[in-house]
Amino acid sequence: INAETIKLRSLISEAHAASNGSAGARTIADIVTNQGVKLSRYRATKLMRTLGLVSCQEPKHRYRKASQEHIDVPNHLSRQFAVTAPNEVWAGDVTYIWTGNRWMYLAVVIDLFARKVIGWSMSLSPDSRLTGKALSMAYESRGKPKGVMFHSDQGSHYTSRKYRQLLWRFQIKQSLSRRGNCWDNAPIERFFRSLKTEWVPTVGYRSFAEAQQEITRYIIGYYCQLRPHQYNGGLTPNESERLYWENSKTVANFS
């Protein structure tokens, strides 16, 4: 075995371990290539087979909920998920995860530019306090931007007076999916599918505290920082945003 193969085996093993054993050959190839070592999907498949590594993803499971309060807010986004800059359009949703002896609810906010998770919150109740905390985290972490559009489904935790007041305070424009149509918020659905197939154990977590720790680790350490995203051309959300701001600075200096 030559030195190059030994190095590739090591990088593949590290990437597989970092993904909690969920990454397949394509994801492994993108991760290693993003680290500066070129690796094709075909070769990754062969080396993973040699190392006895397989992707241990579970079937997807999706959570939908009904609205308890109807308000007249149009679908401003209309499935236009490709945006041109960060902080133009954010999207949010809620899912549930088993934690020992009851369900825990996870609310997330994603910036659609690079599919980066910018806000999240976990609670034992799927209410507007949960979704409000996720939105507040996003708003603070992004430097309190103006002119953002926020898109979600028609769940009561997004249509409540309390949540709409928070949007008004942050000067964020609200957009709601059509009732019962999950494709109107497809990027969030894909994130939840990735989380549950790549990271969350089949039987859930042993406790609320363990779930908080592991899901935060997935979002910060793996999904945003290490996991390549097809929408970003194989780049991670963090790298895609970094390149945008770097290019924006270059254009500004040139101008």
Regions found by a protein language model. Give the residues of each.
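Basic, flexible linker segments flanking DNA-binding modules
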Residues: 1-85, 181, 236-248
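RNase H-like polynucleotidyl transferase catalytic core
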Residues: 57-62, 122, 150-154, 168-187, ...
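C-terminal domain-tail junction helix/linker
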Residues: 168-172, 194-255
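Mobile genetic element proteins and their domesticated derivatives, centered on retroelements
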Residues: 12, 28, 44, 48, ...
